[in-house]
Amino acid sequence: MASPRTVTIVALSFALGLFFVFMGTIKLTPRLSKDAYSEMKRAYKSYAKALPALKKMGVSSVLLRKIIGTLEVGCGIVLTLVPGRPKDVANFILLLVMLAVLFFHQLVGDPLKRYAHALVFGILLTCRLLIARQAEDRPEREERREEQINAQEKNKVKVS
């Protein structure tokens, strides 16, 4: 039977991956929801207007939306299907994307209900990353602890 930590990581990875594939697809194409796609286009236009530096770098609202959508789809697929270290990399990239999205929402003055999802999924991504990293650090700590105990035992003087 799998450990609770493993079950948690797998469940979070799968759920978060599917969510980001879905949301990224909405940003890229109107096939899933025309209304949501139109809303995304409108929102990204306001983000691009609020950051004139993007325009100076040649990043239009369309390009920004497509970059973020592609990152979400790609990293969502990795979180859902790819085992091992690439999941942590995808998790970190998505966490950075969520921070950028929160920044954009704050920049344009959106109310909390417009960006609550980004806040919640940013927290979930952080939790998933912390749990995954904690699971990897534990064997190393135990090995170091055993080495310290062995070193202490060697330094003890036997009294007989």
Curated annotation (Swiss-Prot):
Protein's membrane topology: Multi-pass membrane protein
Principal localisation: membrane
Segments traversing the membrane: 6-26, 62-82, 89-109, 114-131
Sequence ranges on the Cytoplasmic membrane side: 1-5, 83-88, 132-160
Region (Disordered): 137-160
Organism: Danio rerio (Zebrafish)
Purpose of the protein: Molecular chaperone which mediates the proper assembly and functional expression of the nicotinic acetylcholine receptors (nAChRs) throughout the brain. Essential for the proper folding, assembly, function and surface trafficking of alpha-7 (CHRNA7), alpha-4-beta-2, alpha-3-beta-2 and alpha-3-beta-4 receptors.
Disulfide bonds: none
Similarity field: Belongs to the DoxX family.
Annotated GO biological process: chaperone-mediated protein complex assembly; positive regulation of protein localization to cell surface
PANTHER family referenced in this protein's UniProt entry, alphabetically: NOVEL ACETYLCHOLINE RECEPTOR CHAPERONE, SPINAL CORD EXPRESSION PROTEIN 4
Location of this chain's protein in the cell: Peroxisome membrane; Cytoplasmic vesicle; Endoplasmic reticulum membrane
Descriptive protein name: Novel acetylcholine receptor chaperone
Coiled coil: none
Positions on the Lumenal side per record topology: 27-61, 110-113
DNA repair is among the record's keywords: no
GO MF terms, alphabetically ordered: acetylcholine receptor regulator activity
A GO term from the CC aspect: endoplasmic reticulum membrane
Family matches, as InterPro entries: TMEM35A/B (IPR040399)
Keywords for this protein: Chaperone, Cytoplasmic vesicle, Endoplasmic reticulum, Membrane, Peroxisome, Transmembrane, Transmembrane helix
